């Protein structure tokens, strides 16, 4: 299995958030993680990427047990996270941000070549490569966040609400970017409140409820959509 989570418990102090989460994620898929506000979606992604420590349970990525490893070692293995909100370094230029994405590697020429490739793949970044990144628009910043994550050479990308705060037009662009990355072989776990966007690009849907995965289905399975709507609309 590509990513395998078994009976995962995560607390904040005495507050129990994840209470026995188990899920299997296949390589090459876009997996959509749904759940009400506060259900623990961000907590789960942060636990996979090593930013949170679980109380018990295990997380396996290919042949490696991730829990217990430092977050930078998890990143080196190829599991990268895009956090909620846009995490770029606002006072640095586009290129400087991309260089940071390659921080764990040393070969300067190879890094420069990859930055060139990234600027071709996302022409808007190429055009604004020398701009301070705080001057980029919301959608451009989101593109930079994705490019930055790709610089880490991720195999699995964990994305927490990439469409947050974007206009409908830019939301479509983010969706296209995500499907494009997936076609190139990147596996993606997506947390997305925009149900229409999430369901339109996901292969598999997981619903987090009461600290567990309460539902898991193919996104083509309509009962998954109904279940998700029930959670979101409370109906
Ligand atoms: N660092 C923290 N310390 C204490 N409690 C936390 C911390 N982070 C999150 N929580 C709590 O844990 C619960 C789960 O939070 P989490 O951010 O994982 O939810 P979420 O599903 O991502 O919600 P949203 O959809 O609003 O982003 C919430 O009740 C939240 O208040
Ligand atoms: Mg969240």
Predicted regions and their residues:
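ABC-type ATPase nucleotide-binding domains, specifically the catalytic core motifs of the NBD
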Residues: 13, 69, 94-113, 121-123, ...
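Conserved ABC ATPase signature
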Residues: 132-136
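ABC ATPase C-loop
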Residues: 149-150
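Helix-to-loop junction immediately C-terminal to a conserved catalytic motif
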Residues: 49
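Conserved ABC transporter NBD signature motif
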Residues: 57-65, 77, 111-115, 217
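Catalytic Walker B motif of ABC-type/P-loop ATPase nucleotide-binding domains
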Residues: 157-161
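The feature captures the beta-strand-to-loop junction immediately N-terminal to the Walker
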Residues: 34-36
């Amino acid at each position: 299995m590509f990513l395998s989570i078994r009976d995962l418990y995560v607390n904040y102090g005495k507050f129990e958030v994840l209470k026995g989460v188990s899920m299997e994620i296949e390589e090459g898929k876009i997996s959509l993680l749904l759940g009400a506000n506060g259900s623990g979606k961000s907590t789960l992604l942060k636990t996979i990427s090593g930013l949170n420590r679980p109380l018990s349970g295990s997380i396996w990525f290919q042949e490696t047990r991730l829990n217990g490893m430092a977050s930078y070692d998890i990143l080196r293995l190829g599991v990268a996270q895009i956090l909620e909100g846009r995490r770029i370094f606002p006072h640095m230029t586009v290129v400087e941000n991309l260089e940071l994405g390659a921080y764990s590697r040393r070969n300067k020429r190879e890094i420069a070549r990859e930055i060139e490739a990234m600027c071709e793949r996302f022409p808007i970044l190429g055009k604004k490569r020398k701009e301070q990144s705080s001057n980029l628009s919301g959608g451009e910043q989101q593109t930079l966040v994705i490019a930055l994550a790709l610089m880490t050479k991720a195999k699995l990308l964990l994305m927490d609400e990439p469409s947050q705060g974007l206009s409908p037009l830019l939301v479509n662009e983010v969706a296209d970017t995500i499907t494009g990355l997936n076609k190139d072989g990147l596996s993606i776990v997506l947390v997305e409140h925009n149900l229409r966007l999430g369901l339109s690009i996901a292969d598999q849907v997981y619903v987090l409820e009461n600290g567990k995965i309460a539902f898991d289905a193919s996104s083509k399975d309509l009962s998954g959509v109904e279940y998700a709507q029930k959670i979101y609309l409370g109906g």
